[in-house]
Amino acid sequence: MDVLSVSEINAQIKALLEATFLQVRVQGEVSNLTIHKVSGHAYFSLKDSQSVIKCVLFKGNANRLKFALKEGQEVVVFGGISVYVPRGDYQINCFEIEPKDIGSLTLALEQLKEKLRLKGYFDEENKLPKPHFPKRVAVITSQNSAAWADMKKIASKRWPMCELVCINTLMQGEGCVQSVVESIVYADSFHDTKNAFDAIVVARGGGSMEDLYSFNDEKIADALYLAKTFSMSAIGHESDFLLSDLVADLRASTPSNAMEILLPSSDEWLQRLDGFNVKLHRSFKTLLHQKKAHLEHLVASLKRLSFENKHHLNALKLEKLKIALENKTLEFLRFKKTLLEKISTQTLTSPFLQTKTERLNRLENALKLAHANLKLPQFGALVSKNNQAIELEALKRGDKIELSNEKTRASAEILSVDRV
């Protein structure tokens, strides 16, 4: 048996292993994952409960992965055994990697969803509100598609006042993602201008999952999320649920359904307006009746106040005339009394003069009583005792008195007198 050097034996092992294990599929758990920042190569180990084997995924193959390779993942790698002669190491040179039990596209989509969820792409507080009465809507679709024809037909029936603008876009196949992104950005560029769109609708009819999968792309999700214009995703059928549906401000199950959700029904609004008109007429009629009644009440109150004010002024004038008459009468009586006092005592004792004096005193008392009545307030009463006017200060407990005004007389008894 020939003696071999270390290099020779490693070289023979390399030739044997690489020829024997040219293509292998190996299942295991990813561990010790390292991605080289400069080269982009990924180095990791694949292990099960008993063994470990080293693996390498070079940059070119890594870029073709549909999902992100992570520590602890259960995967199936496809590749070939390679031996590094200087160290006698062997490893699997991975050409493809798929997650165990689920497809790589499915895993990639779930990973992307989680990434976007953490960035807030699905949060309701980041969604823009649906416009109530859209005037101008951008539809991102193929201008020759059945979806566009259906959308125009429904829009013309529901809300013909709305202008529907088709932005012709490639909706499947190679170049679809870039075309959709460019159309979204273009439509949104009119934001805050006189030609701004009230809504952007990304729409296409049904198809295979391969046809629709472009709308799970992160670039389309970014374009929808960053748009300042309200957006809708209307891709495929009710059963098709794509990433664009989660990111857009609103999802419609089909392109036709998008028009039914976005555009109000002119027939329904005409019925509503008729109802509003009836309610408005009733409310106005009721309000007019209330205001009319209130006005009539105010007019009546004004007339009553005017009459009372006029009556009060006349009463004041009469009061002034009565006071003037009283003063003149008192002045005359004083003059007569003074004149009589000048007559001698003997003359006063004469029956004739005595009679005249008594009559004069009666007249004076009557005048005082009339004076008290004249000074009676509008809402007051004359106080008298034994048919003689009496001041309040002269009253005492137990006195029987009479209260009177122009319309009423009443009797009363003094229960107590408080001096102020």
From Swiss-Prot:
Alphabetical keyword list: Cytoplasm, Exonuclease, Hydrolase, Nuclease
Superkingdom classification of source: Bacteria
S-S bridge residues: none
UniProt enzyme class: hydrolase
Record-listed E.C. numbers: 3.1.11.6
Location in or out of the cell: Cytoplasm
Recorded catalytic activity of this chain's protein: Exonucleolytic cleavage in either 5'- to 3'- or 3'- to 5'-direction to yield nucleoside 5'-phosphates
One cellular-component annotation, GO: cytoplasm
Functional summary from the UniProt entry: Bidirectionally degrades single-stranded DNA into large acid-insoluble oligonucleotides, which are then degraded further into small acid-soluble oligonucleotides.
Description of how the protein assembles with itself and partners: Heterooligomer composed of large and small subunits.
Protein name as annotated: Exodeoxyribonuclease 7 large subunit
The organism of origin for this protein: Helicobacter pylori (strain ATCC 700392 / 26695)
